[in-house]
């Protein structure tokens, strides 16, 4: 029987594009007989190979820089607009050669569709192969770069690439994405499946805990917590002080979402992946404001309006009074509303017509 492939291009910017894509790939593996050709950065693919190792016989990987995203200043959350633009110019110029190489590699494969989250390379490859091409995201780089007044030629190149999408799977908290003119399907929140046995073990072993993350794309000099005696789980890139029970999760930890779900309070950059993991696990969420980032500001505004999160300024990380934060979270976050949301992982394959 001929192998049928789903080709998936995932942004190499940060890590949460990959983690939510892994949730979808898991379901493709469980619900269909498709093989998956996964293209992303070397760092992201290394994580994916380990996470999906039980499906190794149906996976093929290619390491490739698929996005620039937003470049941040050293040891901070602020976007370096000049450096972002500096890196985008040669990246856009490289698309033609990258797409040509991908088409040569894929042209003899039987392909069901091309998925992209949300690198323009996937949209361009799908168009060249003349197969259905589906975008998946809560934003595109068009509105992100417009917000920062990136060169118009760069923005037009992204618009042109996205114009080849046949369908767009829109995650929760989506920006308006006016440049997307294909049909859309609403997906909601999507995250990797939780291991409730592991979560129970973590709670028993560590007791009360916090989860602090700023994502793998940025580094923060220091976070200082005050008046807290529980365990603090942190991801790489953060130096946390103020507690003698700090556990830094290794960069290759496969299930940070289980540690998040075992925690009483989640303090994080307002990226979509961590938000989705927290919301679907019904966790009280404290988001770090980055007024310079359109997506983060939009996410925080929506979640606060819906009583699903509270926010703090980046400057407050120097002295986080945890009892005060917990009081604010208890006052302003509605557990009733939080419990209305669920992980759409098992529904997305059918929703996108892959089954």
Language-model regions, residue ranges each:
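A nucleotide-sugar donor-handling region in carbohydrate enzymes
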Residues: 144-217
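Conserved nucleotide-sugar phosphate-binding/catalytic loop shared by glycosyltransferases and other
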Residues: 30, 34-92, 315
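C-terminal alpha-helical cap of glycosyltransferases
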Residues: 322-328, 337-355
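Donor-nucleotide binding loops and adjacent catalytic segments primarily
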Residues: 25-26, 190-265
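A donor-sugar binding/catalytic signature common to diverse glycosyltransferases
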Residues: 114-117, 258-298
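Short amphipathic alpha-helix
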Residues: 18-28, 44
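Nucleotide-activated donor-dependent transferases that construct or modify glycoconjugates
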Residues: 2-14
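Conserved nucleotide-sugar donor-interacting segment of glycosyltransferase catalytic cores
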Residues: 101-159
